[in-house]
Amino acid sequence: LTAYPLNPTFRSASRKETSGIPYTQEELDSLSQEYYDFTKYLLSNYQDSKKVFSIMPVVTMDRWLSGRDLASDESPGVCTESDSAPKARIDNMIAYISTISNAIHRAAQENSASKSKVYLTCEINSFTCAQNNPAIKQAINSVIPHAGCDLVGLAGYELLYYSSTAHRNDPNFLRQAFNYLASQAPDHPDFPGGKNIVISEVGLREQQGTQSDADWFVNTFLKT
């Protein structure tokens, strides 16, 4: 479920994770209440169904942190420390995600008799710069380790670009990429051994790229 905040109190401030202006406690409280109520509704309404819900409150997190949209920017350029997301944006994103995380987990604890599950999924869309140079701050190494995400989703546009060009003949590239993502995500008791990485968007765009690239990526992706 892609679930953006609906509360008017918070929606008026929803761009602050981009601007870097700190959230007020009132804004965070309204955010917390909304996701607590939503999680409680899911767990109580579907308590006997054994359904699993994945709530994703922000998509392509790196676009919000750095302003770079890798869905259209197929050549991110060189990886330098100037590519790092500003600290103020990182701090705001951690505050935003961790507030939602605490609300979801509090509701889950209070409704532990429910047979359904609700997990917080945090989607990133860029990580190769941080993988190659840890000094570069992206969502995967600056937000994910601290925000309380249950699952880490990957929007794979950047991964598709690199794997089908510079790393086309490297059979280990995708595996190394997934292993890196797992190394940055905190362990989760429901997904032991770093198994809390999910593919939220494969990254194949219609009518762009060649069919052979798409076929190669999908086949390699599934094998990995």
Q: Residue locations for each model-derived region?
A:
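Solvent-exposed, acidic/flexible segments
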Residues: 24, 28-32, 86-97, 133, ...
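Glycoside hydrolase catalytic-domain groove-lining segments
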Residues: 132-210
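Short, flexible loop/turn elements at secondary-structure junctions
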Residues: 3-7, 61, 124-128, 156-158, ...
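Substrate-binding cleft and catalytic face of glycoside hydrolase catalytic domains
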Residues: 1-89, 108, 114-116, 159
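Aromatic-lined carbohydrate-recognition surfaces of secreted/lumenal glycan-active proteins
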Residues: 52-58, 90-136, 190-207
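Acidic (Asp/Glu)-rich catalytic clusters
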Residues: 1, 41-49, 109-113, 139-148, ...
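Generic structural signal for well-ordered alpha-helices
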Residues: 32-43, 90-108, 174-186, 218-223
